[in-house]
């Protein structure tokens, strides 16, 4: 999936998004 971090709206795979909170 995709994830959205509360700090910045990054949409992409959680595995490549270190700022994502799954």
UniProtKB/Swiss-Prot annotation:
Antimicrobial peptide. Active against Gram-positive and Gram-negative bacterial pathogens. GO terms for biological process: defense response to bacterium; defense response to fungus; killing of cells of another organism. This is Defensin D1. Keywords: Antibiotic, Antimicrobial, Fungicide, Plant defense. Belongs to the DEFL family. Group II subfamily. It comes from the Eukaryota.
């Amino acid at each position: 999936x995709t994830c959205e971090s509360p700090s910045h709206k990054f949409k992409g795979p959680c595995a490549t998004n270190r700022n994502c909170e799954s």
